[in-house]
Protein backbone atom coordinates (compact mmCIF):
# COMPACT_ATOMS: atom_id res chain seq x y z
CA UNK A 1 0.00 0.00 0.00
CA UNK A 2 1.02 3.65 -0.41
CA UNK A 3 1.96 5.95 2.45
CA UNK A 4 -0.53 8.83 2.70
CA UNK A 5 2.25 11.35 3.25
CA UNK A 6 5.30 10.41 1.15
CA UNK A 7 3.27 8.22 -1.25
CA UNK A 8 5.90 5.48 -1.25
CA UNK A 9 4.91 1.81 -1.22
CA UNK A 10 5.27 -0.02 2.09
CA UNK A 11 4.26 -3.32 3.64
CA UNK A 12 2.00 -2.85 6.69
CA UNK A 13 3.22 -4.59 9.81
CA UNK A 14 0.01 -6.39 10.74
CA UNK A 15 -0.19 -8.01 14.17
CA UNK A 16 -3.06 -9.36 16.25
CA UNK A 17 -3.10 -6.10 18.21
CA UNK A 18 -3.32 -3.75 15.23
CA UNK A 19 -5.13 -5.75 12.56
CA UNK A 20 -8.20 -3.49 12.83
CA UNK A 21 -6.15 -0.28 12.95
CA UNK A 22 -5.72 1.81 9.81
CA UNK A 23 -2.05 1.92 8.83
CA UNK A 24 -1.78 4.97 6.62
CA UNK A 25 1.86 5.97 7.18
CA UNK A 26 5.01 4.10 6.26
CA UNK A 27 7.41 3.35 9.14
CA UNK A 28 9.80 6.12 8.00
CA UNK A 29 7.13 8.84 8.10
CA UNK A 30 5.46 7.50 11.22
CA UNK A 31 8.62 7.63 13.31
CA UNK A 32 9.07 11.32 12.45
CA UNK A 33 5.83 12.29 14.20
CA UNK A 34 6.94 12.82 17.79
CA UNK A 35 4.18 12.44 20.35
CA UNK A 36 4.12 15.33 22.78
CA UNK A 37 3.88 12.98 25.75
CA UNK A 38 7.23 11.40 24.88
CA UNK A 39 9.23 14.56 25.61
CA UNK A 40 7.77 16.01 28.82
CA UNK A 41 7.67 19.79 29.01
CA UNK A 42 5.16 22.43 30.05
CA UNK A 43 2.20 21.03 31.96
CA UNK A 44 -0.13 23.71 30.56
CA UNK A 45 0.72 23.79 26.83
CA UNK A 46 3.09 20.89 26.13
CA UNK A 47 6.06 23.01 25.03
CA UNK A 48 9.25 20.93 25.38
CA UNK A 49 11.61 22.04 28.12
CA UNK A 50 10.56 23.53 31.44
CA UNK A 51 7.70 22.07 33.53
CA UNK A 52 6.02 25.47 33.12
CA UNK A 53 7.05 27.65 30.17
CA UNK A 54 7.35 31.47 30.53
CA UNK A 55 4.28 32.08 28.33
CA UNK A 56 2.05 29.87 30.47
CA UNK A 57 3.47 31.37 33.64
CA UNK A 58 2.44 34.76 32.25
CA UNK A 59 -1.06 33.46 31.48
CA UNK A 60 -1.33 32.13 35.02
CA UNK A 61 -0.20 35.47 36.42
CA UNK A 62 -3.11 37.04 34.54
CA UNK A 63 -5.49 34.49 36.05
CA UNK A 64 -6.04 32.88 32.65
CA UNK A 65 -4.70 29.35 32.94
CA UNK A 66 -5.73 27.04 30.09
CA UNK A 67 -4.52 23.45 29.95
CA UNK A 68 -3.92 22.35 26.36
CA UNK A 69 -3.20 18.79 25.23
CA UNK A 70 -1.21 18.76 21.95
CA UNK A 71 -0.88 15.33 20.37
CA UNK A 72 2.35 15.80 18.42
CA UNK A 73 5.25 18.24 18.07
CA UNK A 74 5.22 20.52 15.03
CA UNK A 75 8.37 19.34 13.31
CA UNK A 76 9.43 18.66 9.72
CA UNK A 77 6.97 15.92 8.78
CA UNK A 78 4.16 17.63 10.67
CA UNK A 79 4.77 20.80 8.66
CA UNK A 80 4.64 18.80 5.43
CA UNK A 81 1.34 17.33 6.58
CA UNK A 82 -0.14 20.75 7.40
CA UNK A 83 0.91 22.18 4.04
CA UNK A 84 -1.06 19.52 2.21
CA UNK A 85 -3.97 19.35 4.64
CA UNK A 86 -4.58 22.99 5.48
CA UNK A 87 -3.20 24.96 2.57
CA UNK A 88 -3.59 22.55 -0.36
CA UNK A 89 -6.95 21.19 0.81
CA UNK A 90 -6.01 17.50 1.03
CA UNK A 91 -8.55 16.84 3.79
CA UNK A 92 -8.46 13.05 3.30
CA UNK A 93 -4.95 13.16 4.73
CA UNK A 94 -6.43 13.75 8.19
CA UNK A 95 -7.19 10.02 8.31
CA UNK A 96 -3.54 9.64 9.29
CA UNK A 97 -4.50 10.80 12.79
CA UNK A 98 -7.93 9.19 13.11
CA UNK A 99 -6.80 6.57 15.62
CA UNK A 100 -4.98 9.08 17.84
CA UNK A 101 -7.89 11.53 17.78
CA UNK A 102 -10.34 8.81 18.76
CA UNK A 103 -8.16 8.04 21.78
CA UNK A 104 -8.43 11.56 23.23
CA UNK A 105 -10.15 11.47 26.61
CA UNK A 106 -10.62 14.92 28.13
CA UNK A 107 -13.58 15.89 30.30
CA UNK A 108 -16.13 17.79 28.21
CA UNK A 109 -19.81 18.34 27.46
CA UNK A 110 -19.10 19.87 24.08
CA UNK A 111 -16.19 19.88 21.65
CA UNK A 112 -15.83 23.36 20.16
CA UNK A 113 -13.52 23.92 17.16
CA UNK A 114 -11.85 27.29 16.70
CA UNK A 115 -13.75 29.01 13.87
CA UNK A 116 -12.44 30.73 10.75
CA UNK A 117 -13.67 34.12 9.65
CA UNK A 118 -16.33 33.98 6.89
CA UNK A 119 -13.76 35.36 4.44
CA UNK A 120 -11.20 32.69 5.29
CA UNK A 121 -13.82 29.93 5.18
CA UNK A 122 -14.94 31.00 1.70
CA UNK A 123 -11.33 31.01 0.58
CA UNK A 124 -10.38 27.64 2.07
CA UNK A 125 -13.84 25.99 1.81
CA UNK A 126 -13.34 24.03 5.03
CA UNK A 127 -12.39 24.66 8.64
CA UNK A 128 -9.37 22.52 9.47
CA UNK A 129 -10.10 22.65 13.22
CA UNK A 130 -13.69 21.51 12.73
CA UNK A 131 -12.60 18.45 10.73
CA UNK A 132 -10.18 17.55 13.51
CA UNK A 133 -12.92 17.97 16.12
CA UNK A 134 -15.34 15.73 14.21
CA UNK A 135 -12.83 12.87 14.30
CA UNK A 136 -12.89 12.92 18.10
CA UNK A 137 -15.36 11.19 20.39
CA UNK A 138 -17.89 13.68 21.70
CA UNK A 139 -20.55 16.19 20.75
CA UNK A 140 -19.26 18.91 18.41
CA UNK A 141 -20.92 22.31 18.74
CA UNK A 142 -20.19 25.41 16.65
CA UNK A 143 -20.76 27.98 19.36
CA UNK A 144 -18.11 30.51 18.32
CA UNK A 145 -17.78 32.81 15.35
CA UNK A 146 -14.86 34.95 14.23
CA UNK A 147 -15.47 38.32 12.67
CA UNK A 148 -12.14 39.36 11.18
CA UNK A 149 -10.21 38.02 8.24
CA UNK A 150 -6.63 38.59 9.37
CA UNK A 151 -4.62 35.37 9.41
CA UNK A 152 -2.33 34.97 12.42
CA UNK A 153 0.36 33.51 10.14
CA UNK A 154 0.79 37.00 8.64
CA UNK A 155 1.09 38.80 11.99
CA UNK A 156 4.04 39.43 14.26
CA UNK A 157 3.99 38.04 17.79
CA UNK A 158 3.35 41.55 19.14
CA UNK A 159 0.39 42.00 16.80
CA UNK A 160 -1.06 38.67 17.89
CA UNK A 161 -0.88 39.60 21.54
CA UNK A 162 -2.17 43.16 21.15
CA UNK A 163 -5.00 42.70 18.69
CA UNK A 164 -8.68 42.83 19.71
CA UNK A 165 -10.43 39.56 20.49
CA UNK A 166 -12.17 38.47 17.25
CA UNK A 167 -14.31 35.70 18.77
CA UNK A 168 -17.97 35.85 19.78
CA UNK A 169 -20.24 33.27 21.42
CA UNK A 170 -23.37 32.64 19.36
CA UNK A 171 -25.11 29.93 21.42
CA UNK A 172 -25.76 29.54 25.17
CA UNK A 173 -22.86 27.86 26.97
CA UNK A 174 -23.80 28.50 30.61
CA UNK A 175 -22.55 25.72 32.88
CA UNK A 176 -20.90 23.75 30.07
CA UNK A 177 -17.52 22.05 30.22
CA UNK A 178 -15.92 22.79 26.88
CA UNK A 179 -13.02 21.26 24.98
CA UNK A 180 -11.59 23.69 22.42
CA UNK A 181 -9.91 22.20 19.34
CA UNK A 182 -7.36 23.78 16.99
CA UNK A 183 -4.72 22.57 14.57
CA UNK A 184 -1.43 24.07 15.83
CA UNK A 185 -0.58 25.67 19.19
CA UNK A 186 1.94 28.47 18.65
CA UNK A 187 1.64 31.36 21.13
CA UNK A 188 -1.64 30.26 22.70
CA UNK A 189 -3.36 33.58 21.97
CA UNK A 190 -6.04 32.00 19.76
CA UNK A 191 -7.16 29.49 22.36
CA UNK A 192 -6.93 31.97 25.23
CA UNK A 193 -9.04 34.53 23.38
CA UNK A 194 -11.68 31.92 22.56
CA UNK A 195 -11.66 30.64 26.15
CA UNK A 196 -12.03 34.19 27.46
CA UNK A 197 -15.20 34.73 25.44
CA UNK A 198 -16.64 31.40 26.55
CA UNK A 199 -15.98 32.13 30.22
CA UNK A 200 -17.60 35.55 29.80
CA UNK A 201 -20.66 33.75 28.40
CA UNK A 202 -20.90 31.45 31.42
CA UNK A 203 -18.91 28.33 30.51
CA UNK A 204 -17.99 26.33 33.60
CA UNK A 205 -14.65 24.80 32.61
CA UNK A 206 -12.48 24.93 29.49
CA UNK A 207 -9.50 22.95 28.25
CA UNK A 208 -8.08 22.42 24.77
CA UNK A 209 -6.64 19.88 22.34
CA UNK A 210 -4.44 20.65 19.35
CA UNK A 211 -3.03 18.32 16.75
CA UNK A 212 0.43 19.90 16.99
CA UNK A 213 2.56 22.02 19.33
CA UNK A 214 5.20 24.31 17.80
CA UNK A 215 8.71 23.92 19.21
Language-model region placement:
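Glycine-rich phosphate/pyrophosphate-handling loop used in enzymes and phosphotransfer proteins
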Residues: 1-215
Amino acid sequence: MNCYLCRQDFLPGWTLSNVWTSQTLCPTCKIEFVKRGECGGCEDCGKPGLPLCPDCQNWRNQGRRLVTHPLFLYQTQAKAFMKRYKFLGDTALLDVFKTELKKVKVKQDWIVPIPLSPERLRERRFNQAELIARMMRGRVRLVLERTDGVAFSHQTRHERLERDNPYHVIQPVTGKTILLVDDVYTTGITLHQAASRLYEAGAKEISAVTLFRSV
